[in-house]
Design a protein with these regions (language model features):
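Serine/threonine-rich low-complexity intrinsically disordered regions
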Residues: 21, 36, 44, 79-84, ...
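Alpha/beta catalytic cores of nucleotide-metabolism and tRNA/nucleoside-modifying enzymes
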Residues: 1-32, 94, 212-223, 244-436
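Non-catalytic, usually N-terminal nucleic-acid engagement modules in DNA/RNA processing proteins
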Residues: 1-147, 380, 384, 393-396, ...
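Context-gated lysine
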Residues: 25, 36, 57, 66, ...
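Glycine/Thr-rich beta-alpha phosphate-binding loop at enzyme active sites
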Residues: 123-127, 151-244, 253-284
Length: 436
């Protein structure tokens, strides 16, 4: 499981960007900066393209990292772009997709799930047509340059029944199994807050994607799945588990690579004076109350230079004395480090407790939850700041739902059963239907 840093959100990040990419290697940079203007077009795409090249030159190339490009479709969802400009949006994306493939390692499909502003667009015909046009454009470019097949991620949407049906039909009707090697799951930003669910909502879609991969032209190629915009510890624990479980399924077929992106580590560091800091040392998770308490050796390992070390020490001194930081983002790289250490810890725990085998041995969700509950009891005693009551409940609810899909997967992968399970999941999530 890999975390992808979301770049480009703040101006003049400078050394902070490099301090982060030295850890993550990879960074996600969006085209949104060239698409939210009233007069957006090829000229504004040229500017954001130059920004991405410059970011890559300064922050990913020096560390042997990679750029992932987000399509900027969020501008459409938010209403910065109206339906009358869809073709211009598709054309701008196409120019970047076709011409900048040596700059980016991966790129996400241009998706238009609905519009928060232009409600007249939110009907099945218009949404399907817009996304069909976008995907047909991408397919045409891929056919001209087969290198792009390995770089292209198809973004799935699923939180409304009509939406999932459309994306499923797009995949089938456009024969995307011949073109799509990599998959991503979108629509999850703010989903828990909007619905009140505690469990991780992406289990069903992950199994659906895995099944699509096994019926595609790319069986045997690495199975890559990206989760857009997740950040909670319980969600990341589940991604780490799914990666291990799917690798077990595909042991004789291919490798599995899962990843996620989030702006949360940087935002949390800006907004909160006290957030726990984690460091995994010799298999033990060290927990500090805040970045102010961490050993100087960790400061040196994260900072990009002796000068940066001094800047950080001065910021820690300001924080300790109740003064305002000179740069609100100063501790962002430290929170990224902390979250990466927590991710490693989750992966270690999944192996230590052999949770994949626990899933495989369980003959019912009740038996599985009993076993998982015992593990979580131990972990909450040893690491109460990580495995809080809320996190434990979320993990248990998520594993219960994962068992249903595991049972489906190992017992024939019946398409009719999958459809029924998927509709049950969507109804359970309960996101308001916005599509007529």
């Amino acid at each position: 499981m890999n975390y992808v840093y979301v770049a480009g959100g703040q101006q003049n990040q400078g050394v902070l960007d490099l301090a982060i990419t030295r850890q993550t290697k990879n960074a996600l940079h969006s085209l949104v900066g060239g698409l939210k203007q009233a007069d957006f077009g090829l000229h504004t795409i040229e500017q954001v393209t130059a920004d991405i090249r410059q970011f890559s030159k300064l922050n990913t190339v020096p560390v042997g990292g990679k750029i992932l490009t987000d399509s900027g479709g969020y501008s459409f969802l938010r209403g910065d772009i109206g339906p009358s400009l869809i073709q211009m949006l598709i054309d701008c994306y196409a120019v970047y997709f076709e011409s900048e493939y040596e700059t980016y390692e991966y790129i996400f499909s241009l998706d238009m799930p609905y519009s928060e502003k232009y409600h007249g667009f939110n009907n099945k015909n218009d949404i399907y047509s817009a996304n069909e046009r976008s995907l047909k454009s991408a397919i045409g470019i891929i056919e001209l340059n087969q290198v792009l097949q390995a770089k292209y991620y198809f973004v799935w949407h699923f939180k409304m029944a009509s939406q999932f049906s459309m994306w499923n039909n797009l995949y089938k009707n456009l024969d995307l199994g011949r073109y799509v090697r990599n998959h991503a799951i979108g629509g999850m930003v703010g989903l828990k807050r909007a619905t009140g669910i505690r469990y991780s909502p992406f289990t069903a879609m992950s199994f659906h994607v895995l099944n699509s991969y096994l019926n595609s032209s790319f069986v045997g190629k690495e199975f890559r799945l990206h989760f857009l915009g997740i950040y909670s510890p319980q969600d990341r624990f589940h991604v780490a588990f799914l990666e291990a479980l799917f690798q077990e399924y595909l042991a004789d077929i291919s490798t599995v690579a899962m990843s996620y992106d989030s702006i949360n580590p940087m935002q949390a560091a800006r907004m909160n004076k006290k957030i726990p800091f984690f460091n995994l040392k010799d298999g033990i998770l060290e927990v500090y109350n805040s970045v102010n308490e961490i050993p100087i050796s960790i400061v040196h390992s994260i900072a990009t230079s002796p000068e940066h070390v001094q800047v950080i020490l001065e910021e820690i001194d300001r924080r300790n004395n109740g003064f305002r930081l000179q740069n609100a983002g100063s501790f962002g790289p430290f929170n990224v480090y902390s979250n990466l250490e927590l991710d490693k810890f989750f992966e270690m725990l999944i192996k230590k407790y052999d949770l994949v085998s626990v899933m495989k041995r369980s003959t019912s969700p009740t038996g599985l939850i009993s076993c998982i509950g015992k593990v979580l009891d131990d972990l909450s005693r040893d690491y109460p700041q990580v495995f809080t009551r809320s996190v434990q409940q979320s993990i248990q609810q998520t594993f219960e739902r994962a068992w249903r899909w595991h049972n489906w997967f190992v017992n024939g992968r019946n398409p009719q059963v999958a459809e029924e399970l998927m509709l049950t999941v969507i109804n359970e999530i309960g996101f308001p239907n916005m599509i007529c």
